[in-house]
Amino acid sequence: MTIGIIGAMEEEVELLKNSMPSVEEIVIGGAKFYVGEVAGKEVVLLESGIGKVNAALGTTLMADRFKPEVIINTGSAGGMAEGLAVGDVIISDRLAYGDVDVTEFGYTYGQVPRMPAFYQGDAVLLKKAETIYREYFAASENKAVYGLVVTNDSFIMRPDQHETIRTFFPDVKAVEMEAAAIAQVAYQFDIPFLIIRAISDLANQEATISFDEFIHLAAKQSATCIIELLKTI
C-alpha cells in the first residue's frame, strides 16, 4: 500500500521526511515529493506549497503519478471553536470552502458547481484515528477534536472574516488554506482521505504572532499523530 501525505510548508513535512530511513526527492511543477518509508509504510510525502491551487496541483500530480491508496493531510490550522488551544489536534470529518459563493445559481454557500457542498473524510480512517488519539492524548494537556474544517485562500484573523465564516458554517472547528482542495481532488480520484491538523493559532488578531511562534509545535503534533496512525494501517 502506498500512502500519500501532504503538507503545505517545509515545517509541516520536515519531521515526517526526517523519519524516512532513505529518501528519493522528485520535483514536478514546483511540487516537492519525497518517496520513502514512514513507520514501516511506503509513503509519498508532498510539500505542496501554500493555498488551494498549489494543494490541488500537488494532489493531482500525486494521484496521477504515484497512485496512493490513501491520502492524509498534515499541518497547522487556526482554531475557531471554543475550548481549542494551541497544540490541540483537529481531525476533520467534513470539509468545505469558505470563500466560494455561487448561491445565485442555487448552490449552497461554499459549494463549487457540480461538486458536493461538503467533502467527507474516510469513515474507517476517522474511526482508527478516534481510537488511537483517545489513548494518545489521555495523559496530555492537549486533546483531539473532530468536526468541520473550512478552507479559505486567506489567513483568517479579522473579526469580519470570523463573522462570514460563522454565518455560513456555525459548527466550524478550524480554518486553514489547503484541506478542502486536497479533499476535492481525492474525491474526484476516488481516493480515501483524512485531514489531521494541529492548532497553531486561534484565528484572531494575535494569530500572526501565534502562528510564527507555534508553527513548529503544531507541525510536530500533527506529524506525530500521523505516524501513530500509520502504525495501524
Curated annotation (Swiss-Prot):
The lineage of its organism: Bacteria, Bacillati, Bacillota, Bacilli, Bacillales. This is 5'-methylthioadenosine/S-adenosylhomocysteine nucleosidase. It catalyses: S-adenosyl-L-homocysteine + H2O = S-(5-deoxy-D-ribos-5-yl)-L-homocysteine + adenine; S-methyl-5'-thioadenosine + H2O = 5-(methylsulfanyl)-D-ribose + adenine; 5'-deoxyadenosine + H2O = 5-deoxy-D-ribose + adenine. Its EC number is 3.2.2.9. It comes from Listeria monocytogenes serotype 4a (strain HCC23). One of its GO terms (molecular function) is methylthioadenosine nucleosidase activity. It is an enzyme of class 3 (hydrolase). Keywords: Amino-acid biosynthesis, Hydrolase, Methionine biosynthesis. Pfam families: PNP_UDP_1. GO terms for cellular component: cytosol. Pathway: Amino-acid biosynthesis; L-methionine biosynthesis via salvage pathway; S-methyl-5-thio-alpha-D-ribose 1-phosphate from S-methyl-5'-thioadenosine (hydrolase route): step 1/2. Substrate binds at residues 78, 156, 177-178. The active site is at 12 (proton acceptor), 201 (proton donor). Belongs to the PNP/UDP phosphorylase family. MtnN subfamily. CDD domains: MTAN. Catalyzes the irreversible cleavage of the glycosidic bond in both 5'-methylthioadenosine (MTA) and S-adenosylhomocysteine (SAH/AdoHcy) to adenine and the corresponding thioribose, 5'-methylthioribose and S-ribosylhomocysteine, respectively. Also cleaves 5'-deoxyadenosine, a toxic by-product of radical S-adenosylmethionine (SAM) enzymes, into 5-deoxyribose and adenine. GO terms for biological process: L-methionine salvage from methylthioadenosine; L-methionine salvage from S-adenosylmethionine; nucleoside catabolic process.
